[in-house]
Every structure is written in structure tokens, then in C-alpha cells.
Amino acid sequence: MLGVNGQGKSNCLEAIGYISALRSFRTQLTKPLFQKNTNEFQLFYEIEHERLGLTQVELQIKEKHKVLLIDGDPVKRLADFIGLFPVVPLHSGDLMILRGSPSERRRFFDMTLASVDPDYFEALRMYHRTIQERNHLLKMRSKDLAFDAFEKELAKFAFSLVTKRKEGIGQISQILANVYKAFSEDNESPLLAYKPDTDLASVHDYEQFFAEQRKKDLIMGSTSRGPHRDDYVISLAIGGAKEYGSDGQQRGLSVALRMAQASLFELKLKI
């Protein structure tokens, strides 16, 4: 794709990539994607799909509302859409997966796992919704009884997320090691490890945990512990890649992560 600066090459790539997860690879926000003085945009795709054949997709995007159509039929659940049209972007911002905060790594691996497992996407969505509801109760300093129902649901989704993350990261770690060795000159295998903030044996254990955290969380006004605080660590022989990896190693690993993501999509989604 050739063109002068400011002609819209990146915008075109951004529009292509948007279909994957209904978000841009450069920002989590929707508002910066609108043309000046507008509050919505539409995207139309015609795709030769491996399983669906020739497919037309229409996206109508507003700041707080999205309409998705596949061959003219509305998509009722986002979980049914994520993963249908996977796109793997490769861009300079990928270095933040290595160098950035835990939220950068959670975002990358959440989207990777959600794209190949609708149940993961649904557990993630419901976990964050329930966290918001519990946080509202904490700010309102509600009675203990009001928390019980929310914490029961929160425990169920927390246990599901941690279980699925363990399984998924185990698969990605093996793929990552093979991919990195294939193009790296240092001939070592990186290790991807999942570091859960809470690693408990059952849903009941999570219920007890959130109940025990309630007093502390009331003081803070938010839910301080749980899978939304998880992290992932990539290590080389010298130690953690974030702390000890050279600039070249970090760049190589960021590329390898995207290649591993593509390989996982190919394996799980049969594309």
C-alpha cells in the first residue's frame, strides 16, 4: 500500500483490523476514530471466508452503541462475533506488551483467548460487569447482605477465568517458544508464565476470599484483588524479558507474540 504522508494508509489498515474485535489496534477508545464533527461511522466488508464463503459484514459504530450485520442478519451477541474474522496486527505499540503495565499484557492475552473461546469472552465480560456492580456497592457502603449475591457470581466468573487462562497460556507458551527459536539467532526458548493474583481451588474458595476482602475493599472503594490484577511474565535465560531483555530481544519477542497469536488462531479456528 503506497501513498504520501497523511493520505490514510494507516486508517485503511485500522479499518481492516477493526473487524477482529471491534476496536482499533492503536486505541481502546471509540471517540478518536470518528471523523471531525461526527459521532458515528460505518464499515462495510466483503470477505472470502474459509468456512463461511463469500460474506458481507456491516458495522454501524456509535460511541456507546454498535450494530453488527452479517449478510444482512443482525448479530445478537458479541461473543458470537469475536473470533469469526481474526486479524493479527503487527505494529510498534506491541512493545508495550513487554514493556508496559500488567494491563497491557492482560489486554493482549484476553483478546487472544477470547477470539478462540466464546466461553472465555463471556466469562470475561460478566466478570468485569460484576466487578463494576460490586465496586458500586463498595462506594455506597452497602450492607453485607447486598454483597453476597454479587460475590457469588464474581467467584464463579473469577474461577472460570483463571482456569481458562492457565490452559490457554500453556498452549501459547509452547507456540511462542517454537516461533521465537525459528527466527532468533540467540537459540533460546522464551518461557511465558501466567501469574494469577489469586489462584484458588474452587468457586467456593473465591466466594470466601471476596468476603474476606470486603472490609479492606470498603476502605479503598474498589475491588483490590482478583483476576483483573493478573499478570504474565516472559522470561529468557538471563531473567525476565521486561527487566533484562535487550532492545533487540524485546522487539523480537513482540513479533513472536503476534506470530504465536496467528498460529493459535490457525490451530483453533481452522483458518
Language model region names:
Residues 9:
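Conserved lysine of the Walker
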Residues 38-45, 134-139, 160, 206, ...:
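Alpha-helix boundary/capping detector
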Residues 24, 139-143, 267:
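Short, flexible helix-adjacent loops and helix caps
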Residues 17-104, 110-116, 120, 170-181, ...:
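Nucleotide-state sensing region of NTPase/ATPase domains
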Residues 96-184:
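An accessory alpha-helical subdomain
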Residues 1-4, 18, 145-271:
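Conserved NTPase motor "head" modules and their coupling/switch loops across ABC/AAA+ ATPases, GTPases
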